[in-house]
């Protein structure tokens, strides 16, 4: 999209030249103003974007003040010098700026005229979506189980696009997905559980790491879960090894940390996981230690029992893991009752973002190849910090790391 980039000596001013042949799928030119409008829209607290925190992660000038409503969006450090020149001002040099630009939809441009013409219906159907990439949406409804893309002839690299289109089917049942694959309705399908064992010797079968972390997020505003010993007891009383080998059986590996192996390396080629090591044992499976922590926590709360609801989405894998956790917790922690609440992913996320849940089973995948993609989720006020964890020292450490002060 940009044909050139210039960086000032202090690394605080970045100037991008937009390609002259960059066009929207309706034929309108892509301009620098499209980026200014889009970034301001993400930063605007009224938009309530899930990825608003990316604006601050990128160290864009005045990002924190704009996203918190202390300053107007017009003061965000992004402007159009002319139709094809985008100027970005940073509050401090950002080592991962290029990663961020290439990773998140929040930094893509938006055609302001088109967005405003759609009103509240923007991005709810194929007719209210506009593309500037190799494909455009030809069929999509919010409740549909299929999204169809076709080649975008207005794309500046259209001659290099070899596919006429791509079709995505949203299938929550693994058996149904596998049957569709066998019938020739799908070219690629993700397998889990017993289906992995069924297909692992098939020449069409292959494995790869998707970098996603499945994790539990307790709502720290809920009674009982606001107690650190109760949370530690929950963390230590289920067997992650058993989840990967007996429940999922899909090549997943257990982790006692959040930044996975293979995500990023330093200038010496050392993997972050090796450099960071493991500083805590709170997540290590140890039933006897968990029982002691549980007993201590109940005593501090003045209770002899607790009841929580575990929320998960309606996929086979998520439900199987949730059922395993329910069994482990109730068997290992006397006086604990766990109810399961199964919801479609969209509904689950809405409840978790509003803080209307007890314990959530959710997942997170890396947006860019740097540990910060996992670490700044937990800063105070982050839209992905469902647990409402808040620690001033942690916030300060993350902020220093972003600026390169550590």
Identify what each model region corresponds to.
Residues 31-38, 83-89, 93, 134, ...:
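Alpha-helical secondary-structure segments
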Residues 17, 34-36, 47-113:
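Surface-exposed binding/hinge segments that line
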Residues 142-144, 287, 291-366:
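Ligand/substrate-recognition segments at binding pockets and active sites
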Residues 254-296, 315-319:
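Structural transition elements
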Residues 153-198:
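Ligand-site clamp/hinge motif
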Residues 244-245, 281-284, 335-348, 373-406:
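Extracytoplasmic/peripheral linker and loop segments enriched in polar/acidic and small residues
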Residues 1-9, 130:
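N-terminal lobe/hinge region of extracytoplasmic solute-binding protein
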């Amino acid at each position: 999209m940009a044909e050139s980039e210039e960086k000032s000596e202090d690394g605080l001013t970045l100037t991008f030249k937009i390609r002259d042949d960059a066009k929207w799928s309706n034929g309108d030119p892509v301009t620098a103003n499209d980026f200014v409008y889009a970034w301001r829209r993400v930063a605007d607290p009224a938009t309530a974007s899930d990825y608003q925190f990316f604006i601050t992660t990128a160290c864009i000038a005045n990002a924190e003040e704009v996203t918190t409503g202390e300053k107007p969006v017009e003061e965000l450090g992004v402007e159009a010098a002319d139709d094809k020149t985008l100027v970005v001002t940073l509050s401090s040099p950002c080592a991962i700026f290029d990663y961020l630009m290439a990773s998140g939809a929040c930094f893509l441009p938006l055609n302001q005229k088109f967005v405003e013409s759609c009103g509240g219906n923007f991005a709810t159907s194929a007719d209210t979506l506009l593309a500037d990439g190799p494909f455009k949406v030809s069929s999509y409804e919010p409740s549909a189980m299929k999204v169809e893309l076709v080649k975008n002839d207005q794309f500046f690299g259209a001659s290099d696009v070899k596919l006429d289109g791509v079709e995505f089917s949203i299938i929550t049942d693994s058996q149904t997905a596998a049957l569709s694959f066998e019938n020739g309705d799908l070219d690629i399908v993700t397998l889990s559980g017993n289906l992995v064992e069924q297909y692992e010797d098939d020449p069409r079968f292959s494995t790869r790491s998707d970098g996603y972390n499945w994790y539990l997020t307790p709502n720290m505003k809920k009674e009982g879960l606001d107690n650190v010993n109760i949370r530690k007891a929950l963390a230590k009383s289920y067997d992650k090894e058993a989840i990967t080998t007996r429940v999922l059986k899909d090549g997943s590996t257990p982790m006692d940390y959040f930044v996975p192996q293979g995500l990023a390396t330093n200038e010496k080629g050392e993997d972050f996981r090796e450099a960071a090591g493991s500083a805590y044992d709170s997540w290590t499976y140890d039933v006897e230690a968990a029982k002691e922590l549980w007993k201590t926590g109940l005593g501090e709360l003045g209770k002899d029992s607790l009841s929580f609801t575990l929320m998960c989405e309606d996929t086979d894998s998520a439900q199987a893991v949730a059922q395993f956790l329910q069994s482990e917790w109730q068997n290992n922690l006397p006086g604990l009752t766990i109810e399961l609440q199964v919801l479609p992913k969209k509904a689950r996320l809405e409840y978790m973002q509003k803080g209307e849940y007890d314990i959530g089973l959710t997942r997170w995948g890396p947006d860019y190849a740097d540990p910060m993609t996992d670490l700044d989720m937990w800063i105070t006020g982050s839209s992905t910090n469902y647990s409402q964890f808040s620690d001033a020292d942690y916030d300060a450490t993350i902020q220093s790391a972003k600026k390169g002060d550590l």
